[in-house]
C-alpha cells in the first residue's frame, strides 16, 4: 500500500471518531423521511443515478411515485424476483448483499476481518442470551447502498425476544471492518432471537453512520433510547418472511448453535448473495 493510500485510510478512521455520528444520522434521517415533492425527487434522482438503481425489478417502477426517499430506499420487489430456496434443510441468505465473513464462532469470538474479531456476548448484549451461540456458526452480510434493503428470515422460527442495543455509528465498509476493533459489537443494533427446530437462532441488524433507522415486524421502527431494551414476543415467521428493513442500510449477522448447520463451501468473504439463496443446510 502506498504512503498516500495509507494516510487516506488513517484519516478516514480518525474522522469516524470526530464526526458527531448520531447527530449527523438524525439530520440525514429527517431528509430521508421528508415528503416534500421537490426535495424527495431530487434526493431519489441523485441516489438512483449515483448507484445505478434498477427499478425494473421493483414493485413500483416509477421513482416519482414514492412518497419519500425512505419509501424508495425500502422498496418492495416484484413477485418472483427473489425465490426462497424451498428445501426444508436449507439456510437462506437474509438479504441481498455481499458476505463480509462466514464461518465458525471460535472461543466465543466472531471473525470480523484480518486481525479483528468481537465477542458474541458483546454483539448480543446479554451474556445469557448469547450463551447458545458461543461455539456456533455465523454469517455477516453487508448491504450496499444499491441493494434491496429488506431483511428476511434465513430459517423458520418463532421470534421470542428483541434486544435493542445502543451504540456508536461507525461507517461499515472494508476499511472500518479492518481498522475499527469490534465494529459490529460497538454500533447500534437490533438483536432478534428465535426458537427453531434447530435450537436458537439470532438475526442481528447492525446500524451505521447515516443509517436513518432500523425497523422490525415486531417492534416497528426503532426509536433510539440510549439504553438496552428487551422485549418478549411470540411471533412465528416462515423462512423467507420479511423480518425487518434498514433505512439507509448496513449489515445483517445470522447466528446458529454449534453442530446444527453447515455453510455451503462455495461461499467466502466478498461472495455476492441474494435474499432467499441457499447459503447452508442443516446437519
Curated annotation (Swiss-Prot):
The active site is at residues 96, 152, 250. Its cofactor is pyruvate. Pfam families: PS_Dcarbxylase. GO terms for molecular function: phosphatidylserine decarboxylase activity. InterPro entries: PS_Dcarbxylase, PSD-B, PSD_type1_pro. The keyword Lipid metabolism applies. Binds 1 pyruvoyl group covalently per subunit. It catalyses: a 1,2-diacyl-sn-glycero-3-phospho-L-serine + H(+) = a 1,2-diacyl-sn-glycero-3-phosphoethanolamine + CO2. It is a peripheral membrane protein. The keyword Lyase applies. Pathway: Phospholipid metabolism; phosphatidylethanolamine biosynthesis; phosphatidylethanolamine from CDP-diacylglycerol: step 2/2. The modification Pyruvic acid (Ser) is found at residue 250. It is an enzyme of class 4 (lyase). GO terms for biological process: phosphatidylethanolamine biosynthetic process. One of its GO terms (cellular component) is plasma membrane. Its EC number is 4.1.1.65. It is found in: Cell membrane. Heterodimer of a large membrane-associated beta subunit and a small pyruvoyl-containing alpha subunit. Belongs to the phosphatidylserine decarboxylase family. PSD-B subfamily. Prokaryotic type I sub-subfamily. Catalyzes the formation of phosphatidylethanolamine (PtdEtn) from phosphatidylserine (PtdSer). This is Phosphatidylserine decarboxylase proenzyme. It comes from Acinetobacter baumannii (strain ACICU).
Amino acid at each position: 500500500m502506498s504512503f498516500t493510500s495509507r494516510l487516506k485510510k488513517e484519516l478516514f478512521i480518525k474522522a469516524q471518531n470526530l464526526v458527531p455520528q448520531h447527530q449527523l444520522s438524525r439530520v440525514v434521517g429527517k431528509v430521508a423521511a421528508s415528503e416534500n415533492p421537490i426535495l424527495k425527487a431530487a434526493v431519489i434522482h441523485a441516489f438512483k443515478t449515483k448507484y445505478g438503481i434498477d427499478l425494473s425489478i421493483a414493485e413500483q417502477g416509477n421513482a416519482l411515485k414514492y412518497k419519500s426517499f425512505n419509501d424508495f430506499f425500502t422498496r418492495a420487489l416484484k413477485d418472483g424476483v427473489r425465490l426462497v430456496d424451498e428445501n426444508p434443510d436449507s439456510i437462506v441468505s437474509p438479504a441481498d448483499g455481499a458476505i463480509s465473513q462466514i464461518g465458525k464462532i471460535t472461543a466465543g469470538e466472531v471473525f470480523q476481518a484480518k486481525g479483528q474479531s468481537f465477542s458474541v456476548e458483546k454483539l448480543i448484549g446479554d451474556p445469557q442470551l448469547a450463551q447458545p451461540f458461543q461455539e456456533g456458526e455465523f454469517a455477516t452480510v453487508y448491504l450496499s447502498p444499491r441493494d434491496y434493503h429488506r431483511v428476511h428470515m434465513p430459517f423458520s422460527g418463532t421470534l421470542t425476544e428483541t434486544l435493542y442495543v445502543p451504540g456508536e455509528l461507525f461507517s461499515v465498509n472494508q476499511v472500518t471492518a479492518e481498522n475499527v476493533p469490534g465494529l459490529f459489537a460497538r454500533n447500534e443494533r437490533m438483536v432478534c432471537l428465535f426458537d427453531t427446530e434447530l435450537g436458537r437462532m439470532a438475526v442481528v441488524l447492525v446500524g451505521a453512520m447515516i443509517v436513518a433507522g432500523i425497523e422490525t415486524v415486531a417492534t416497528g421502527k426503532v426509536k433510539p433510547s440510549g439504553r438496552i431494551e428487551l422485549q418478549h414476543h411470540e411471533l412465528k415467521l416462515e423462512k423467507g418472511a420479511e423480518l425487518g428493513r434498514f433505512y439507509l442500510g448496513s449489515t445483517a449477522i445470522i447466528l446458529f448453535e454449534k453442530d446444527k448447520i453447515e455453510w455451503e463451501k462455495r461461499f467466502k468473504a466478498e461472495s455476492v448473495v441474494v435474499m432467499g439463496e441457499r447459503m447452508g443446510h442443516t446437519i
